[in-house]
Amino acid sequence: MSNRITTDFQFNIGENKLKDFKAFVSKMTETTALNEPNTLVYEWHINASGNEGHLLETFTDSEAFLTHFDNVGHMFDELFTYATITRAKIYGATSDELKQSLDPLGVEYFEHFNGITR
């Protein structure tokens, strides 16, 4: 069984905010890429209408996710001026410490019970 944690955060992007949203997300991506070797996946996706975005992430474990949270958590206030979270799902074995950090975001947790990771 893997210790990896995967996320799917869904956002509604504010009207006339797409350009600013994309620019700000680029800053978050750069911060993540430069400082987090244990963040395995950090991908933003936007629908064709430009009003919904998804952030997909995979971390080696809870500690890697906490490191990510420390690196970009201070950026959330600005992110939320461009978009609001409409769904937050976390898949995998999350530590109690990580849950305390994520609970204010209204996260729904899913524990791994079967499958393979390669």
Region spans (language model):
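Short S/T/G/P-rich N-terminal loop/turn motif that feeds into the first structured element of a domain
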Residues: M1-G53, T60-N71, T81-R118
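A short, acidic, amphipathic alpha-helical segment used as a generic capping/interface helix at domain edges
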Residues: G73-D77
